[in-house]
Each structure stands twice: as structure tokens, then as C-alpha cells.
């Protein structure tokens, strides 16, 4: 009689259990969870791409592409003003949403805090600090460096750097015969000014005609931080991927950059509160006696330079681009500047504040080309909130993409056209919802440097238009369309000819 083979029933049971577990996992990931997210999740009533509703990969890939601003605008056109861009995130294209999300709150009323993972890299500075109390403390201390009285004290410093910029442009333009990448020179100027106001010394970019390694690394770091944030918001398990895509020597350069930052801060701190700059503000107390920690000082220095320099250089470049693309507007602003002053010495912070058309040009440029085109997501607090007339459950990430607001034809007549007159009570634009454009955000967490930005832009542009006639090279006709954006524009050359005023 044949002997039957022995069967390890325990092994079969274990194998069957494994198959069940694996099968259940795949059923959950690819069937059950997507069905729940699409049809039963609290956000399922809001429209958007189905793939984006079941995974964060959709919006993450859009951000990584550098074209998320265009993609989100197109999706709003297709799906409407409230757009589901991830399983737990909504994007709004609504004027009232600005205040619903970021506006001032009554005492005891919870605010919508910065989304913690997105802002993790900025948790120790004004850009991303989470709690209302810490933000208020930082803001009170830093605001002294951005007061009108401080601007007046800073004017000689600003004037010196504008003098240097104009001198370098005059030397290099060869009477209008040689093309100049003016956005690079704007960047040099912005970094030198913000470096001086933060560290007590410039980066030397205008003198050397090149970016300091510190500034160069800022550009590289920004893209890396955005990529890391996208992976973290999908799942932190993806973070090891960064090890394989990190540029060679990046970690070493980051360490060297931190050492340089520490050295610059130590050198500036040794001078004490001796200059009308940001460090003087950061070394002080608020009215309650609160201070910034050493970590917060270091982090805010980096944030001020990143936010300040990039905002100024982007705004200068965008304004120059749109004026050179619109000769009638350029002629008007040049006429205003050159007729308002009898000599260049009269072009001051106070004097340029009265240039109505120049101010309208700057405001329109910031609408057309906001320095930050994307969204800085907030988190709906416990109990939920009403945004744009819709109840949004607690824990939802919400945001407004600057680009999608500024380019929306529901808010602006000829939304994709450059018309400074829309800010000067021109009846053609009476139906514009001008509050839709908020390049510096709204509420208690709006950009602390907004007024400084306007001050610098007016001074630099007025003196540039006083001294030069400017013409855009044809190679840059599609300058804005050719760029990508990662928490700020990754700018490409803006080639112009500068002809000294005769």
C-alpha cells in the first residue's frame, strides 16, 4: 500500500493567511479606499480630477513639474471655484475665501494654522510658525525693522545700492548696443540690500557681478525643500528616495552655508542695536519682554533673505517685462517719472510715493506676476469652518493659489492683459473685483515686508526710468510662460537693451 505524502497543514495555513492579508491590502488600496474617497468622504461633494481625489500624487506631480500654477488655473476653469486637489485638500478661487482662511479672528476664535508638514522647514520663522502666540511674538519684534520711520533711516543704504546698480548697468550696456540680463542684476541688488539689512553687510554681488555661494544655495535648496514636502505629504516612507536624487555635495554645502550664516549673525550681533536694520529688531524685546531664541533669529534671517530678495527681484523683473511688452504703458510711466522731478537727487522714498501711475504699474505687475504663484495651505480647526459659503470639515487643508485668482476672468476684465489703469478708477474696469489680487496675502500673517517691497520697487524703477530707455529682446517675448515656479519663480534671463537717456 502506497504511503501518502505528509502535508504541513501549518505551512499551508500560514501561506493562505498571507494571501488573505496581501489580498485585503490591495483591495483596500485599490478598491475600498478609492470608493470611500470618491463617494463617501466628507469632501466627495467637491469636484476635481478623480485621480487627485484618491491620492496626493496628482497635485504633488503638478507641483514638482513647476507648472502647478497653470494646472490649477485650468482645473478651476473646468471644475469651478472650489476644487478638490487631494484626498484631504481643497483649493479656492473666491474673493471671500481670502478672509475666511487667513483673515483676522476674534479673541477666542481659532485661526487656521499653517499646514504643519508643508511648513515644517519654516517652523521657526514667520513663514511657517504654527501657533498664533509664537507668530504674534515674532511679528511684534520684527515689525520694528519694517516701520515707516525705519525706512527713512534706511534710505541712504538703499540709495547707495541703487547708485551701484545704475553705475554697473551704464558701464555694461555700451550705449544700448549690448544686451543685459537685467533680472540677474535685479537679483544682485535685492540680495545685497537684504543681506545688508539682515547681516550688516552685503553679499558683494553688485561689485563682483556674480551671486555669493550663500545666495546660490538658496535657489537650489528651495526646489529640494518643495520636493521633500511633496514626498512627506504623500507619505514619509518615501523620504529615503531623496537620498538617491540629492545633488552631489548638497549636504556639505548646506553645512557650510549654515556655518557662514552663524558667522555672519555672530559678527552682526557684536555690533549690537547700532543700525536701523532687521537684526536690531530681532535682538530687542516686544512690549511684553519676550525675545527671539537663537534658533528663531537664525531661521528668520534665512526667511527674510529668501522672502525679501526673491520678492523684490521677481517684482522688478515682472514689472520690467510687462512694461517692455506694453510700450504705451512704458511711455506713460517714463513721462510721469521724468516730469515729476527736476533732478535725479529729488527721486526719494517720499517723492516716489506720489507717482500714481508708477504705483498702478507695480500693483498691476504684482497681479500679473505674483512673486509666489502657488498656495500656502492652512488647516481647518476643530469644529470646521465656513469658506466661500461652504462648510469645510476640521482637518482639511485649504489654500488659494495666487495665480488662479489674479488670472480669473470672473474677477478681472481682460485678466490676461496688462492694464495699470484698472487701479486708477478707469471705468472700463469698474466691475473688477480688485481684492481678488493679494500678492502679499491677507490678515495677521500677511507679508511683513509688503511696504518695504513697494518702497524699494518705486525707488529702483523710478531711477532706472530716469536714466535709461529700455527695450526687450525678442528672445524673451514669452519670458513668463517659459518659467517654472517652486515656492517662487526659477527665473530665466530677461535680456534687454538699455539706452542711456540723452
Swiss-Prot record:
Top enzyme class, one word, equals oxidoreductase
- Any one GO molecular-function label of the UniProt entry: heme binding
This entry's Enzyme Commission designation comes to 1.-.-.-
Q: Which SUPFAM superfamilies match?
A: Cytochrome P450 (SSF48264)
| Keyword field contains Manganese | no
Source organism, top-level taxon: Eukaryota
Binding locations of heme? 447
* Localization per record: Membrane
Residues glycosylated per entry: 300, 451
Query: Per the annotation, which location comes first and is thus the protein's main one?
Result: membrane
**Pathway linked to the protein:** Secondary metabolite biosynthesis
Q: Which co-factor is required?
A: heme
Where do the TM regions start and end?
18-38
Q: What industrial or biotechnological use does the UniProt record describe for it? A: Hypothemycin is an antifungal agent that exhibits excellent activity against Peronophythora litchii, which could be helpful for the storage of harvest litchi fruit. Hypothemycin is a strong inhibitor of a subset of MAP kinases such as human ERK2. It can therefore be used as an anti-cancer drug thanks to its inhibitory activity of Ras-mediated cellular signals. It can also inhibit Trypanosoma brucei kinase TbCLK1 which is a good candidate as a therapeutic target for African trypanosomiasis. Finally, hypothemycin also has inhibitor activity of T cell activation.
Per UniProt, what is the membrane topology?
A: Single-pass membrane protein
Q: Report the sequence similarity comment from the record.
A: Belongs to the cytochrome P450 family.
Described by its record, this protein's role is as follows: Cytochrome P450 monooxygenase; part of the gene cluster that mediates the biosynthesis of hypothemycin, a resorcylic acid lactone (RAL) that irreversibly inhibits a subset of protein kinases with a conserved cysteine in the ATP binding site such as human ERK2. The first step is performed by both PKSs hmp3 and hmp8 and leads to the production of 7',8'-dehydrozearalenol (DHZ). The highly reducing PKS hpm8 synthesizes the reduced hexaketide (7S,11S,2E,8E)-7,11-dihydroxy-dodeca-2,8-dienoate, which is transferred downstream to the non-reducing PKS hpm3.
Q: What is this protein called?
A: Cytochrome P450 monooxygenase hmp1
This protein's encoding gene: hpm1
